[in-house]
Amino acid sequence: MEQFKGLQKSLYIWTDNAELDKRVEQLKTATGGEVALENVHRLSFASYASSSFDLIVIECAQLTDNYVKLLHMLKPSGKLHLISFIGAAGSLLQEIKLSGFINCSEDSDNTLTAEKPGYETGSSARLSFAKKNSSTLNVWKISGDDDELIDEEDLLDEVDKQKPDPASLKVCSTTGKRKACKNCSCGLADELENEKKQENAAKQASTENAKSSCGNCYLGDAFRCSSCPYLGMPAFKPGEKVQLVDNLLKSDI
């Protein structure tokens, strides 16, 4: 009992009243404080306030589910001391731990000691992980003393500073008229050349297949219509093949 010296208020739970006064006096002497008495069979009917005792001593450990009640009766960091217990110490310690006690141990004199946590049941505490570390927040903070700025002018070469030739900025087919550049590399020059060849071939075919609608074209200009394709050409024999030049079908204006 020497480890309980200085505890002011204790509760002694008894089963056998033989020499009860002697045991109570020994507890008073060891603690130096007040000692209250309670029968183990009347414990469930008792109405003690929470955090009433610094120490609870039990003669018999046959309490079933009353360990939780003892936990509420003890003050924070209060002690629970079991003597003359029945059964295996390991299973009894496990039951006490599950009731909320800590630092449960078996003493050398075949007694068990446990402790209530240093806080009240149902109490809360503010968690520290919610705090923001100010040094972490300043990691990405830009400071003019720590950063070296680069002059933008140093990023440009002399060639970059020269003004470009406006002629070099023109792109094929962007000036309103489809006309290829001098050094065309986009394929527009080849496309225009193919279109020109197709147009000339179509005109050539139209002149070769020209037919007379009036039947008087071979007689000469005096007998030809104003839109005759043979206008201006000498007379020829009927059925004779005549080759027309390209400019005959074009307007003079």
UniProtKB/Swiss-Prot annotation:
[2Fe-2S] cluster binds at residues 172, 181, 184, 186. GO terms for biological process: iron-sulfur cluster assembly. A motif (Cx2C motif 2) lies at residues 225-228. Its main location: cytoplasm. The keyword Mitochondrion applies. [4Fe-4S] cluster binds at residues 214, 217, 225, 228. Residues 130-161 are annotated as: Linker. Residues 172-186 are annotated as: Fe-S binding site A. InterPro entries: Anamorsin (IPR007785), Anamorsin_N_metazoan (IPR049011), CIAPIN1 (IPR046408), SAM-dependent_MTases_sf (IPR029063). Its cofactor is [2Fe-2S] cluster; [4Fe-4S] cluster. A motif (Cx2C motif 1) lies at residues 214-217. Transmembrane segments: none annotated. Residues 4-129 are annotated as: N-terminal SAM-like domain. One of its GO terms (molecular function) is metal ion binding. It is found in: Cytoplasm; Mitochondrion intermembrane space. One of its GO terms (cellular component) is mitochondrial intermembrane space. Keywords: 2Fe-2S, 4Fe-4S, Cytoplasm, Iron, Iron-sulfur, Metal-binding, Mitochondrion. Residues 214-228 are annotated as: Fe-S binding site B. Component of the cytosolic iron-sulfur (Fe-S) protein assembly (CIA) machinery. Required for the maturation of extramitochondrial Fe-S proteins. Part of an electron transfer chain functioning in an early step of cytosolic Fe-S biogenesis, facilitating the de novo assembly of a [4Fe-4S] cluster on the cytosolic Fe-S scaffold complex. Electrons are transferred from NADPH via a FAD- and FMN-containing diflavin oxidoreductase. The C-terminal domain binds 2 Fe-S clusters but is otherwise mostly in an intrinsically disordered conformation. The N-terminal domain has structural similarity with S-adenosyl-L-methionine-dependent methyltransferases, but does not bind S-adenosyl-L-methionine. It is required for correct assembly of the 2 Fe-S clusters. Monomer. Belongs to the anamorsin family. This is Anamorsin homolog. It comes from Drosophila willistoni (Fruit fly).
